[in-house]
Amino acid sequence: MPNGDRTGGGRLQGEGWDRPLPERPLARKATPLDKDLKKIARLERATVETARSSTRIGIALLFILAVCAYVALKGDAFDNTAIVLVAGVVGAYMALNIGANDVANNVGPAVGAQALTLSGALVIAGICETAGALIAGGDVVATVSRGIVDPAGFADPDALILGMLCALLAAALWLNLATWLGAPVSTTHAIVGAVAGSGIAAAGMDAVNWPAMGKIAASWVISPVLGGLIAAGILLIIKFTILYRPDRVAAAKRWVPILVAVMASAFSVYLVMKGLQRLWKPGPAALGLIGLGAFGLAWGAVHPMVTRAAVGLDNRRKSVMQLFTVPLICSAALLSFAHGANDVANAVGPLAAIVGVSSSGTVAMQVAIPFWVMLVGAAGITLGLALFGPRLIRTVGTKITRLDRARAFAIALSAAITVIAASWLGLPVSSTHIALGALFGVGFLREWLDRRRKRGRIRRAQPLPQWAADGLARAEGAAELEDMLRAEKVKKARKRRLVRRSHLLSIAAAWVITVPMTAVLAAGLYAFARAAWAG
């Protein structure tokens, strides 16, 4: 091949290359018609999106109206039907917001790893959330959430009704804002902060159990750190036992059944401790037997399935990822069931308290949750997920860090293990914070491994190609130039980020301000409503 080099005059110099470079065709200048067509296309897209948004809002309003109609039909059962009607509207609004915000953590990783389509995730999450709420959601809830407020502050029935109504509305408004901003937050923390704010407005600062609030503040750090560390550890185990092995398929046949059995064991204990805690509270020995039994059953069922599925797979990472598909779908379903069993009752607790006081006329520390109240919570969450959940599901699944099925499996398994470990240690944790902490932990582990790998490659840099070496040899200061190029490569490798910092900062900020913001909002609503009520 003839030698040649490129000069600044737009010609190639050398034997056989002494000719002008071909001229690039100039881009056609946009005409007024092109600009008008682009404007019309943008207008059409905006019109379609507006129509879709209007349809979603219309369906949500129909659900709220259906709740109103039901409460109106049961009006004879309440001392103050108007208050229960308002509470039903706010409770339905709250349930819609929980579905739009809080459920994304359960199915987002599976969608991001392409183990589930968005439609499939919505169907599975909706069914499992509803089943968890109605089957294992429990029938009793504390009137004043989690011992945050001294019950004496709500000794008057009117004060309790007003406080719970303001707490419910404040938490719902905050969840709505967080969803609009694209920040997944803890429903339980929103309710706790709102109840605390109502308690302060009703009985002063002394009414709040500040040590309990301190534990909740500690969970802002404990939950994501624990979730992230455990998820990163699980992913490292998967990498070193399967993905880094010369024969990945053989390693996967050995280790995937074990990992799935660990997941089944963890979720069995998780569901008993978290989802069924109001129905049954087993001791450590019973939990251990449940975990061992689930491990054995799962391994016996999964091992032959994985062996059959591995037949014909080539020794590529992408092929091995297929073996994690079914376990990942099952984990998303189990997480949704456990969330429905635990968090739905917490969300409708204030509504149940209002209904209980309106029915009996007295204040009780615990009230029974009527079936229709639990149904409002379950149906509202499912509908909110279907109508408004896809945005946050995409954020959790695709916009924070890139996920494959092994990473998503590590996140799901971490959520169950972290909750169990925290419960045994008596640490306050949030399932929402754990799931997102696990997601960030996996992303930061990817960054660390990527930088470590790239620094190793740069240190073992191969000789430059001959054409580049010849050019550098003719340049003044060739050694310095080569050092500069390699230093620039190191700098770029260090700067490469696999976790989007903008999402990290916005989500962390939303976590920190959820409790104080809902408290301030609830206190303001309570003060305003109290003044209007008295007037």
Map each language-model feature to its residues.
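Alpha-helical transmembrane segments and immediately membrane-proximal extracytoplasmic
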Residues: 2-535
